[in-house]
Design a protein with these regions (language model features):
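The feature captures the conserved acid-bearing segment of alpha/beta-hydrolase catalytic domains
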Residues: 185, 191-250
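Short substrate-entry loop that stabilizes the transition state in hydrolases
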Residues: 64-66, 75-114, 237
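Alpha/beta-hydrolase
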Residues: 72, 107-109, 189, 260
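Primarily recognizes the serine-hydrolase "nucleophile elbow" in alpha/beta-hydrolase
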Residues: 142-210
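N-terminal cap/lid segment of alpha/beta-hydrolase-fold proteins
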Residues: 25-63
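Alpha/beta-hydrolase active-site loop
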Residues: 124-153
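The conserved beta1-alpha1 loop
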Residues: 72-74, 229
């Protein structure tokens, strides 16, 4: 009887310990185009080959090929907040870019919202914060999404731009070592990691480590960076942001730092609002170096 029980348990144990059979991950469009701006759900590669990152793609009218703008969203070390994060859209910024002939991709990175999966860009606690590793992890995710879209016939193979916000901007700084023919410019809105340490305004987790990481990114930088921060940013205030930008520049990075007027009650989120995009519009337009925008419907 004992032998019979063993014979029954062996295949059962094998089933319980076998690796799961995963459905094949597919990339590309996952829904119809809609409003505004031909809004469409897409799936793009992530560092986890079993997980596709959810993304939104917006396009101007016509067949293209269009220059591509990839918007890299902010993040948080709080796992619950990440899990509850809605799909980022950056509507006002997207409208600004669409009006100037860009296709716009907004991917949601691993460990956030509907994409889910493991949070690969975790920086660690204040005592052991690794801002270089976390920034490079974010850069890898941005790069995977960008390269996947560049395979599409309606996207140009050159002159893409990356616009990063907060942690997304930090990843964009790490991506400044990419081919400048593929990515012509980076715009970073209040880039950084570790802001609002313990949810306290104007407190940064391991600021000296963050400064050293900015210098590390600057060493290999090849793409010019426009660094924008609002006067009332309580995550990375202008004084500290200037120090970060200088660390990046002194080690070899090319950076144009601009302090913008206060926007709303918290300037760190300026780029998510129409007022913030308006405040930054001249600087963004200068980076894009484009003629006057085409007429588009308001989102």
């Amino acid at each position: 009887m004992r032998l019979l029980n063993i014979l029954v348990l062996v295949p059962l144990l094998a089933l319980l310990t076998a690796p799961p059979v995963c459905a094949q991950v597919t990339f590309g469009s996952s829904g119809a185009e809609g409003d505004p701006f031909r809004r469409q759900q897409w799936r793009v590669p992530s560092p986890d080959t079993d997980t596709a990152a959810h993304a939104l793609l917006f396009r101007p009218p016509g067949a293209g090929p269009f220059r591509l703008a990839v918007i890299a969203h902010a993040s948080t070390q709080n796992g619950l907040r990440r899990a509850q994060m809605p799909q980022p859209e950056y509507r006002a910024l997207t409208a600004f870019l669409i009006a100037r002939g860009f296709a716009v991709l907004v991917p949601e990175r691993l460990g956030h919202g509907a994409t889910g999966g493991r949070y690969v860009e975790d920086q660690g606690g204040c005592d052991e914060a690794d801002y270089v590793r976390s920034g490079r992890a974010t850069a890898d995710e941005i790069s995977l999404a960008l390269e996947d879209l560049r395979k599409q016939d309606f996207i140009r193979k050159d002159a893409a731009i990356v616009i990063g916000h907060s942690a997304g901007g930090w990843g964009a700084l790490a991506l400044a070592n990419a081919d400048p023919k593929a990515i012509s410019a980076i715009i970073a809105f209040a880039p950084g990691r570790g802001g609002h340490a313990n949810d306290e305004s104007n407190r940064i987790c391991a600021p000296h480590t963050l400064l050293a990481a900015a210098a590390e990114f600057g060493k290999a930088a090849r793409i010019p960076v426009t660094w924008l921060v609002a006067a009332n940013d309580s995550y990375f205030a202008p004084a500290f942001s200037i120090a970060l930008a200088e660390a990046f520049r002194r080690s070899g990075g090319k950076v144009d730092f601009r302090a913008l007027p206060a926007v709303g009650s918290e300037g760190h989120w300026m780029i998510e609002s129409e007022a913030g995009v308006k405040a930054a519009s001249a600087d963004i337009a200068r980076v894009l170096n484009l003629p006057k925008p085409m007429a588009t419907k308001k989102p």
